[in-house]
Amino acid sequence: SLDITVRAAGAIAEHYATRGERVSLATFGGRVAHAVPPASGRAQLRRVLDRMARIQPGGTGGPSAAGRLAVRQSSGSRMTVLLSPLISPEVLDQAVSLGRRGMAVVVIDTLPDHVIDHDDDLTAIAWRIRLLERRREIRMVNGAGIPVVRWRGPGSLDQVIRDIARRTTGPRLVRR
């Protein structure tokens, strides 16, 4: 799932940075915190891609200090894209928190399709149970008005981005 997440983040960064939009990066989990401050252009894309190339799997699975800080410092004028296999509910909790602050948030689900293909029956059952819990958590996030989109390639976000653009032109209710 790390490979899918990094590829998805790279495609999204390329889409926005090369069109003059400001792009930043903050890892949410993992062994080492990675952050790239906001900027635009090809040089920024290179910085983001170089930083993502250094991301290592593992860690506690919880949010890194840089990820928590980036989420707290995000402003309402940005669209925040959270990419995760959504194994832990913490990313979804962060998405709901940002949405309640009035931010445009999209969650990209990068869990591979083959995750429950195990020879061990107990492992397969454990995965099925976790995936049922995960499905319930995703429904709750969707109910809060935050789209969760399965990553299927660069075109995965087209409709969601159009919907968010339409929503951001109207009045918004922000809970404080």
Short names for language-model regions:
Residues 1-176:
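Exposed, interaction-prone extracellular/peripheral surfaces
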